[in-house]
Amino acid sequence: MTEHVQVGGLQVAKVLFDFVNNEAIPGTGITADQFWAGADKVIHDLAPKNKALLAKRDDFQARIDTWHQTHAGQAHDPVAYKAFLQDIGYLLPEAADFQASTQNVDDEIARMAGPQLVVPVMNARFALNASNARWGSLYDALYGTDAISEADGAEKGKGYNKVRGDKVIAFARAFLDEAAPLSAGSHVDSTGYKIADGKLIVSLKGGSNSGLRDDAQLIGFQGPAAQPIAILLKHNGLHFEIQIDASTPVGQTDAAGVKDVLMEAALTTIMDCEDSVAAVDADDKVVIYRNWLGLMKGDLAEEVAKGGKTFTRTMNPDRVYTGVDGQDVTLHGRSLLFVRNVGHLMTIDAILDKAGNEVPEGILDGLLTSLAAIHSLNGNSSRKNSRTGSVYIVKPKMHGPEEAAFTNELFGRIEDVLNLPRNTLKVGIMDEERRTTVNLKACIKAASERVVFINTGFLDRTGDEIHTSMEAGAMVRKAAMKTEKWIGAYENWNVDIGLSTGLQGRAQIGKGMWAMPDLMAAMLEQKIAHPLAGANTAWVPSPTAAALHALHYHKVDVFARQAELAKRERASVDDILTIPLAKNTDWSEEEIRNELDNNAQGILGYVVRWIDQGVGCSKVPDINDVGLMEDRATLRISSQHIANWLRHGVVTQDQVMESLKRMAPVVDRQNAGDALYRPLAPDFDSNIAFQAAVELVIEGTKQPNGYTEPVLHRKRREFKAKNGL
């Protein structure tokens, strides 16, 4: 049992109580008594409201289920269906026009466009890597991934392969010609770079000199002007740096001694307390809060072993250059950090209220992550985050404007507890639940003074799409979802509503994750679709991917693109409400088996590491051994998809169990190299992870909105108790 300490009307887990009093509070200007008294009141005032909002979710779902059951066997009538959703208050009248009025937003969010990382803050090494991914090597990203083909002798190999290196150099020179064109000639022919009279002078083959077509692109340099070691350029609001050192293995093969091009990459990072972590008790939550506190204080550090050597990884300092006018130019050396709190659903026993009930985890996250952020706000930090005095909190999985209003109220109450000016706490609204999508304008309006971000989370959104219409019939195959009418309308609608409510220049309009971290050539080809769609940020799975995705923001001027898109006809709510039902369900046995196996294998591969190792975000090989980033959102889709096919007789429970049991040894084989791994097969009945997977699928229709957290949390706690963790 967790040891608790009585504080006013709260029982606080001792590990959390000690962390707050001894680590988080000192230096904030707030006393422990103040904090706990304020937390007590916030929890007891707002927990009942939180509970009522969850009851409303269940009521809507029950009504929608009944409507579909009543109309079973009939052709779906979209007009009657929409009228029904309006009658019950699910689809609300459109909010009156307004403009968001958020103040004190950092440029990285309001006025720049670039990649966004999402990482589990529970893992200090990942958190530090992401924080430092504001700047990334283009050469490393190209050389070390499939972005550069291994054909024609360009294999990666163990040592440096000059053939491959030359391909990387050629790619980078082409980028320079595109992003910083010369007034005459090409970077391809450059033999030297220097600064003279505040301008870039480029020596070319043949002896001639050239300069930038637009001299304003030169921002600064490092080293002597006549022999700079770095040249800082700017294009589409993003910086990049030509690094020069002819003594390096790469530089000595380059005519101009260029050793790398450093990209300004992950402008922002979401430090995640939610879908990518496995945190089920006070001990887990303190790990999260301690890492976030370290990021806010600027002193997070981690011992890292690499190549037989151990070193301490810390947060990078700012970058300093000599400007063209001779004055110092200082650029942020780190990604601007958001923190993603959990949503409104779960409760946790890290704190118990006066009646002995677990408190809403989202309220706890809000209080603790905001408390930690004071250290960055008040100058205690050696690595300041926001330069405008804001704290950026992403709030996921909200259903409709009442829930957005509740978050707005919660943030106001937290500001009062922490003596923060009103609207210090900013909100990122995840548009990943159907009731938020169709009422998005009203959701933004409910937080119009705090909103700094809307983002389409198509993975969770697909899970909610399936669960909401669970009773309507069998859904299309999972891979076909991406081409269904609702999803394109949903993606466009988010941009349309964001632009019409004045988010440009104040907030990010974001797009979802590239889930295949090993397939960078495909990402380079495809993910340009996100800036073209009007998104000034989109999610990437790694610092390497951030450096490559940054190239897309040099190809697309997102703010100009948004101005074009603002003139188009708005996406249709009717299209968004189009249920992705299969037109016919006469799939072959092989097609059904493949669908089932693919889902089952992904579920098992993710759940086994969640339950057994407490790992909330994994690169899980799919059925074709392609590594996919899996988190709770992908688990929600896969489990709900099987549950839907089971509900409508496309598959039987016996088929589902047979697939799970057949896929378990496949997952075991894929994890054979992990010393900490515990096999799923053959003792299925006593394997907690396997039983969790079974429950998620077989009982999938009963999970609240199709969420996986209730089962995962219960089973992880069972595993920890059984194994003395």
Curated annotation (Swiss-Prot):
Active site (catalytic residues)? 340 (proton acceptor), 631 (proton donor)
Query: What are the UniProt keywords, alphabetically?
Result: Cytoplasm, Glyoxylate bypass, Magnesium, Metal-binding, Oxidation, Transferase, Tricarboxylic acid cycle
Q: Which residues bind acetyl-CoA?
A: 118, 125-126, 276, 313, 541
Q: Name one GO molecular function term.
A: magnesium ion binding
Q: What pathway or pathways are given for this protein in its record?
A: Carbohydrate metabolism; glyoxylate cycle; (S)-malate from isocitrate: step 2/2
Chief place where the protein resides = cytoplasm
Q: Which residues carry this modification: Cysteine sulfenic acid (-SOH)?
A: 617
Quote a single Gene Ontology cellular component term: cytosol
SUPFAM superfamilies associated with the record: Malate synthase G
Residues reported to bind Mg(2+):
432, 460
Q: Which domain of life is it from?
A: Bacteria
Q: What is its EC number?
A: 2.3.3.9
UniProt enzyme class: transferase
Xref: Pfam families = MS_C, MS_N, MS_TIM-barrel, MSG_insertion
* Positions bound to glyoxylate: 340, 432, 457-460
What are the subcellular locations of this protein? Cytoplasm
Catalysis: reaction(s)? glyoxylate + acetyl-CoA + H2O = (S)-malate + CoA + H(+)
Which GO BP terms sit in this record? glyoxylate catabolic process; glyoxylate cycle; tricarboxylic acid cycle
What quaternary structure, including any partners, is listed in this protein's UniProt entry? Monomer.
Q: Which family does it belong to?
A: Belongs to the malate synthase family. GlcB subfamily.
Q: Which NCBIfam families match?
A: malate_syn_G, PRK02999.1
Q: What does this chain do?
A: Involved in the glycolate utilization. Catalyzes the condensation and subsequent hydrolysis of acetyl-coenzyme A (acetyl-CoA) and glyoxylate to form malate and CoA.
Name-wise, this protein is Malate synthase G
Organism name: Pseudomonas fluorescens
